[in-house]
From Swiss-Prot:
Species of the source: Methylorubrum populi (strain ATCC BAA-705 / NCIMB 13946 / BJ001) (Methylobacterium populi)
Function comment: The RuvA-RuvB-RuvC complex processes Holliday junction (HJ) DNA during genetic recombination and DNA repair. Endonuclease that resolves HJ intermediates. Cleaves cruciform DNA by making single-stranded nicks across the HJ at symmetrical positions within the homologous arms, yielding a 5'-phosphate and a 3'-hydroxyl group; requires a central core of homology in the junction. The consensus cleavage sequence is 5'-(A/T)TT(C/G)-3'. Cleavage occurs on the 3'-side of the TT dinucleotide at the point of strand exchange.
Source lineage: Bacteria, Pseudomonadati, Pseudomonadota, Alphaproteobacteria, Hyphomicrobiales
The protein, known as: Crossover junction endodeoxyribonuclease RuvC
Self-association and partners: Homodimer which binds Holliday junction (HJ) DNA. The HJ becomes 2-fold symmetrical on binding to RuvC with unstacked arms; it has a different conformation from HJ DNA in complex with RuvA. In the full resolvosome a probable DNA-RuvA(4)-RuvB(12)-RuvC(2) complex forms which resolves the HJ.
Catalyzed reactions per annotation: Endonucleolytic cleavage at a junction such as a reciprocal single-stranded crossover between two homologous DNA duplexes (Holliday junction)
Annotated gene: ruvC
Active site (UniProt): D11, E71, D143
Amino acid sequence: MTTDVRILGIDPGLRRTGWGLITARGTKLSYLACGVVTSDGDLPLALRLRELHEGLTRVLTTHAPDEVSVEETFVNKDAQATLKLGHARAVALLVPALAGLPVAEYAANLVKKTVAGNGHAEKVQIQAMVKFLLPKAEFKLADAADALAIAITHASHRGAIALDRRHAVAAGSGPGAARIAAALARLDR
């Protein structure tokens, strides 16, 4: 018997980090919630990262996902912007890891290919396909739609690949070790 798995997708960004929550039961997907966590651009970097940490922690506490998927960082020509994105991505990886949740990572072109059938799809195409796959989804910002696309990608690929166990707390240690072991056991069935 297949059980519902609550999957949180995260689209990291320093200004806006999108999040999207779905349930997957086999190949059936259902929309639960989505939104963005923002940081104040006038604050120093450390305080902006704290805002993202607190916001994502609230999302995890409120929505209790079973698994988390995060978009990988792409390198662009602006090194400073890439570094800032890397900081936000680190928070997006750290928060679920501290909660004892398994985390998977997906490249942007794989997300686009999975959701729209084209690894170079435009944002408008991604949003249209997210709406098609999750008809009840309501998102006002592209960041939330992207996060839902990341969650959809994880739902599509989670049975075919094992989660990257490097993000798991060492067996038997840490407050989330039991929850990670249970989540990984569900994946191995």
